[in-house]
């Protein structure tokens, strides 16, 4: 079953994106390089608690 997860910027810790992932097949935390409008640059966004 897919669940919604929030992605937060590592620099400013703001939650800028949300996506879904299958928690049964992907047990580790998701980390993607995305654009943060608060930092005004591309940073790593990691999965955070809701």
UniProtKB/Swiss-Prot annotation:
Any Gene Ontology CC annotation? ribosome
Which keywords appear in this protein's UniProt record, sorted alphabetically? Ribonucleoprotein, Ribosomal protein
Tell me the Gene Ontology biological-process terms attached to this UniProt entry.
translation
What Pfam families does UniProt report for this protein, alphabetically?
Ribosomal_L33
Gene Ontology molecular function? structural constituent of ribosome
The family classification in the record reads: Belongs to the bacterial ribosomal protein bL33 family.
What's the protein called, per UniProt? Answer: Large ribosomal subunit protein bL33
Gene name for this UniProt entry:
rpmG
């Amino acid at each position: 079953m897919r669940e919604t997860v929030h992605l937060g910027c590592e620099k400013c810790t703001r939650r800028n994106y949300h996506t879904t992932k299958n928690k049964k097949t992907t047990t580790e935390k998701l980390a993607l390089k995305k654009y943060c409008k608060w930092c005004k640059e591309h940073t790593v966004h990691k999965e955070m608690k809701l």
